[in-house]
Amino acid sequence: MSDKPTIVFLGPSYPYRGGIASFTERLAREFQSSGFNCLLYTFSLQYPSFLFPGKTQYANEARPKDLNIKEAINTINPLNWLQVGRELKRLAPDFIIVRYWLPFMAPAFGTILRIVGQNKHTKVICIADNIIPHEKRMGDKMLTSYFNHAVDGYIAMSAQVQHDMATLGINKPIQLLHHPLFDHFGDPVERMMARKELGIDHQGGLLLFFGFIRQYKGLDLLLEAMADPRIKENGYKLVIAGEFYEDPVKYTHLIRSYQLEDQVILFNEFIPEHKIRYFFSAA
């Protein structure tokens, strides 16, 4: 192993897609540029296909050449957890940075980290996107407690997450650090050029709803707001850019019932990283 301090990241990264994977890869690059040796332990299986609500879990971009990524963790195979735990125990990195956003991950991560902790060297830091999930299920608290006992300290991504930790009685060091600005999606594009790239023929105000769509995201409330006569009179349009993780019929019905067909532009798809700048520049 290198003489540089070593960080292992546990959580989604390539070939998996999404905001957490993108964040983890960007963070690893930042640590590498600061002199750390970084290894990314991603999933060999993240979710069984029948549990995943989207079209695919996988990115369509090329594999990053500047990151050391290992597809190692199978979230539903306890024998795999033991194997990965023993491997990381022997590796003895200085730090493990683990992402936590869903109690489903607690058995795998909690078991792996317990085994790693036996080396009495590696410190485990959790970046907590959520501690209490948006969509609650029986057993969530028990699973999160199992995970928590294997963690040395937390970074909370919002004041709400920090509050949720107190609610659950988590008595570990917690640092509140808000989500940094992403700077790896390319430079901004002139507004009308961005709209042309997306095929949007509109000169007026443009609002953007970006990201996958589930009930707790509030798109139904935004569509209700778009029906306000003041919004219509000022010529605003709404771009919805993201994949539906639930039946879209509810939302298409709202669009029709509020007579928003001419105000809503829908991109029902996962937006790849190279296109993201166009959506934010167009709005």
Can you describe what each PLM-predicted range is?
Residues 200-217, 223-226, 239:
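Conserved donor-binding/catalytic core segment of Leloir-type glycosyltransferases
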Residues 246-250, 261-272, 279:
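Active-site donor-binding acidic/aromatic loop of nucleotide-activated sugar
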Residues 43-47, 235-252, 269:
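Glycosyltransferase donor-sugar binding loop
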Residues 186-200, 253-255:
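A short helix/loop element that forms part of the nucleotide-sugar donor recognition site in Leloir-type
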Residues 32, 117-118, 132-152:
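A conserved, positively charged/aromatic
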Residues 13-17, 29-90, 161, 166, ...:
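N-terminal strand-loop element at the rim of the active site
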Residues 149-188:
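Donor nucleotide-sugar binding/catalytic pocket of nucleotide-sugar-dependent glycosyltransferases
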Residues 148, 277-283:
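Short alpha-helical donor nucleotide-sugar binding micro-motif in glycosyltransferases
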